Curated annotation (Swiss-Prot):
Coiled coil: none
Function summary: Involved in the catabolism of the rings C and D of cholesterol. Catalyzes the ATP-dependent CoA thioesterification of 3aalpha-H-4alpha(3'-propanoate)-7abeta-methylhexahydro-1,5-indanedione (HIP) to yield HIP-CoA. It can also use the hydroxylated analogs of HIP, 5alpha-OH HIP and 1beta-OH HIP. It requires that the side chain at C17 is completely removed.
Catalytic activity: 3-[(3aS,4S,7aS)-7a-methyl-1,5-dioxo-octahydro-1H-inden-4-yl]propanoate + ATP + CoA = 3-[(3aS,4S,7aS)-7a-methyl-1,5-dioxo-octahydro-1H-inden-4-yl]propanoyl-CoA + AMP + diphosphate; 5-hydroxy-3-[(3aS,4S,5R,7aS)-7a-methyl-1,5-dioxo-octahydro-1H-inden-4-yl]propanoate + ATP + CoA = 3-[(3aS,4S,5R,7aS)-5-hydroxy-7a-methyl-1-oxo-octahydro-1H-inden-4-yl]propanoyl-CoA + AMP + diphosphate
Name of this protein: 3-[(3aS,4S,7aS)-7a-methyl-1,5-dioxo-octahydro-1H-inden-4-yl]propanoyl:CoA ligase
Entry GO MF terms: ATP binding; CoA-ligase activity
Binding of ATP, residues: 177-185, 391, 406, 497
Membrane is among the record's keywords: no
Enzyme Commission number: 6.2.1.41
A Pfam cross-reference name: AMP-binding_C
Family: Belongs to the ATP-dependent AMP-binding enzyme family.
Keyword terms of this UniProt record: ATP-binding, Cholesterol metabolism, Ligase, Lipid metabolism, Nucleotide-binding, Steroid metabolism, Sterol metabolism
Amino acid sequence: MINDLRTVPAALDRLVRQLPDHTALIAEDRRFTSTELRDAVYGAAAALIALGVEPADRVAIWSPNTWHWVVACLAIHHAGAAVVPLNTRYTATEATDILDRAGAPVLFAAGLFLGADRAAGLDRAALPALRHVVRVPVEADDGTWDEFIATGAGALDAVAARAAAVAPQDVSDILFTSGTTGRSKGVLCAHRQSLSASASWAANGKITSDDRYLCINPFFHNFGYKAGILACLQTGATLIPHVTFDPLHALRAIERHRITVLPGPPTIYQSLLDHPARKDFDLSSLRFAVTGAATVPVVLVERMQSELDIDIVLTAYGLTEANGMGTMCRPEDDAVTVATTCGRPFADFELRIADDGEVLLRGPNVMVGYLDDTEATAAAIDADGWLHTGDIGAVDQAGNLRITDRLKDMYICGGFNVYPAEVEQVLARMDGVADAAVIGVPDQRLGEVGRAFVVARPGTGLDEASVIAYTREHLANFKTPRSVRFVDVLPRNAAGKVSKPQLRELG
């Protein structure tokens, strides 16, 4: 019997007790009631235990939004382990680095997906801790999921005990977020934090078991995992995963499933609004949308309300180190407030603006710390418990936060954080590049995209196409610069550091 309800296994147990026959999950090829979802989770958890996964182990998922992701994630928690989501856009090199540092013994990886075979692309020799790879079928019947489940037939009895032993303070997940030095950091969050933050997010949107939630946001991101899977788990809302965003497919899904909840970055709504077939679909069921992660024009919020007929449109601000949360607008806020601010603190957060303008957050949902990096943890969370976000902002008289700049030069491309230092390190290794710097520039569809400024060595014949092609080989697509400017020298300040403001002036 699970007594403490502040764990993911407890949340699923409660859902089954309260809504046993309620539709919990709808995928392209399968539907799950709450009870059927619990049974599938127990089967996968038993298989993990049979494969030798121990409590506090870290198990990774490198796959898109299918029902397998949901089941695998919850199964990892039931086995007492922590889930490590990997961005599906990562290259094999990027994924290998994270898997190595996490010491993951098991990986759920997509088979053929968008022209790449992630499971086959890994260098297993570089990952001695990785004992098992479970292939998740996405575009082809090339998975090993059924074989994986079969291995757990003799371990089902062990699952309940494992699940009951999970404590609220145990680490539930490790999401990796790029750092200003260019190397990713693993953010440790506990069960109580992940559940508390996602429950607060759902409460702001008044989400209930009557809602149907189309999850376009990727599960490897807090917006899809905590504001998606865990929010539905705690409210009973029906989760409908969307594998890859396509405006027409999304419009069909909204009409077919009578979708009420549709979060996503601004580009999602812009694509739906601009689609020539939009008026052919009944979108009247839409009720609640949350956007952010980029500049949001007032006119977009107004069009979402008037043309998509969404009752509640909110914006929010958060970061991985705060469980993806921080501030959020409220249903009663007007379109201007929603578009021009990030709202007020929620999820038990306190907000303060430091003397230098940096946004600080404090509360029980600030991360446990960074994986194997006490120095970085101490730098991020001060002695008084304030999380230093690296963002510059201001608070208006109503308490709404407005982000005005980023201390760390990070920009957001299509909802994904990009740290220039990581891209710059890749460019520095390219033959013919003497110096390089990267900034984010506005883009109508993606919010911001990268622009590289390159100092080429004489006689190398570098051009824009070759630089972009090189970075695409080594980085995820959203990190790849979309344009290149060649300059004789990079502008630097008195301390010898590249002056990003001057680069922005150069365009």
